[in-house]
Amino acid sequence: MEASRKDSGGRPTIKAVAAAAGVSTAAVSQAFNAKGRISEATRRRILDAATELGWSPSATATALRSARTRTLALVVRRPTDVLGADPHFSELITGLEGELAPRGYGLLLHLVADVAEESALYERLAAEGRVDGAVLTDARADDPRPPLLRGLGLPAVLLGAPRPDAPVPTVGLGNQGAGIHEAVDHLMELGHRRIAYVSGPGELLHTRLRRAVFEETLLLKGVEPAAVLTTDFSEAAALAATEELLGMAERPTAVMYANDSMAVCGIGAAQRAGLRVPQDVSVVGYDNLPIGRWLHPRLTTVDQQVQRVGAAAARALLAQCGEDVPDTALDDRPRLVVRESTGPA
C-alpha cells in the first residue's frame, strides 16, 4: 500500500493525497484544476491533505491544467492608503510588466489585509485556474506561503535576498545589509554620532535584517543608536516617528528611514518644525525611488534597484512557466547614493 502512494523517487503521489482526503484522484484533479463540481469543504480537505503530505501537482501540471492563463499574480499585504503613498510597488510593477507584457502575459494585482486572506486568495486563484504563478513580496519568518503555493501547484518566486534553502526561488540583490552599512559609515564620516533609525514592521525579514545591520554597525564603532522606532510604513506613522525623534531632549543629528516614502515624510516634518535639512538634521532613505531626485534637498538613499529586481522576478517566474527567458541572476548589492539630504553634523 505504501509503495502505491509514492513514486519511484519516494515522493507522495496524487493517490496518496486522494486517500488522505478520502476522495478519488479525479476529485484531487478537480480541486487543483477548477473543473467538475466539488464542494468547498471537499476542496479544502484536499488542499490540506496535499499541503500536509508535501505533494505538488507541478510535475503533472500539463495533465491537470488544459491551458495557460498567461496571467501572474502579485498579492500585496498593505492597506490601500499605505500602498498609494509608496512608489516602491509602482517601480516593482514597472519592472515586472517590462518583462511580462512583451511576452503576452498580464499581472493580476490583489491587496489583502492579513495572511489568512492572502492564503485563501491563493487557494481560490489556483482552484479557479485564474493564474499561472505568483510573485511573493515581504518575506517573513516561517512564511506559510511558499509551501502553500507548492501544494497548490502554482509556480512562485519570493522577492528578497537569495536563499538556497528557500522552498521557492528567491530573487533579489545579494548582501542586503551592505547599503545600510554604507549609510552608517557615511553619516559617521560626516561626524554624526546621534543616529536614529525608523524601521518597518518587525515581522518582515528585510526589516529585521536592516535594523540588525544598523545596530551592529554602530555598536562595532562604539556608538549606541540614538533611537530605533518601528512603524507600519504609513505616512502617519513616519510623521509621528519623526516628531517623536525631533522632540527628544537630545535629538538625533541624523535619521535613517526604512524606505524613501517615510524619508520624504521625515524631511517634511523636520522642515515644518523649523529645522534645515541637512544643516540641522541629515536624512537617509532606502529604495532610490525617482521622487528622491526631485526633492529639495535631493535625498541620500540606498539603491536596491527595484525595477531591475522586478524584471528578474518576472523572468524567473516565466522560466517556471516554460518560457525561454534570459538568465535571472542579479550579481549586485544595494549601494548608497549620496545626495544633498546628508551633511556634516
Regions found by a protein language model. Name each.
Residues 2-7, 20, 52, 98-102, ...:
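Bacterial carbohydrate/catabolite-sensing allosteric modules
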